[in-house]
Amino acid sequence: MDDLIKLERNVRSTYATTLSLLASRFHYHLPISDRDVPGSPRVLFLGNHSSGKSSFINHLAGAEIQQSGLAPTDDGFTLITYGEVEESMDGQTVVTHPDLDYHDMADLGPEFLAKLQYKAYPAENLRHLTLIDSPGMIDSASGSQLRGYDFRECVRRFAESADLILFFFDPDKPGTTGEAISIFTEQLVGLDHKVLIILNKVDLCDHIRDFARTYGTLCWNLSKTIPTKDTPRIYTTYIPDLATGEPDQKNTIPLSLIHI
């Protein structure tokens, strides 16, 4: 992977010193984008607030990197990747940093940059991987007005450059919020091949009938939102360290059969 990064930098250097001059001379504009010379794989986390996105990231990294809670804990995007030492940057630094490929995010506005964060952490599971945590979606399609920046446009921009998009739901909120409907029907159009739908926190379902009811509700809501003939596959998961189920209780879900 280090050789790939060096090759990427050489390509960008050649473009800047040679190809860009030719493009300027012949009045031809074709800048390199992140998708032209890809770096480490990117995973975008979307979902309703308190659906377990940040907790899942912490579990994956094996460290408490993101703050998590029942109430919305953040209103901006967070870029999380590997670093030899723990480090954080604000949004303005991220889009102007010469070694980071987020320069094109600068045009999303100062309000977006004020809430954008970059976190590097020495967790081996993050090596050669970038995770993008997003604010929890709310029951209003006009969330951009509440956040102060164009949330939907930011989602689209990150989704286009992401290699995988994980969309989280949980048993407490198996329905689709106003923002979720907007994201599915507008911002993720043409990108559905990247999306995996996750029903998280299934350990909160005390009985198998509770799980069936929750799963069915989510399927029904998604069928009215996603314009496809068949309901997309829904993956179920939970975080073992946070599990609340009691395996010896009658009719409880056999959590040992659920794979993360």
What are these regions (language model features)?
Residues 42-44, 78-81, 130, 167-168, ...:
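Beta-strand cores of modular interaction/reader domains in eukaryotic scaffold and signaling proteins
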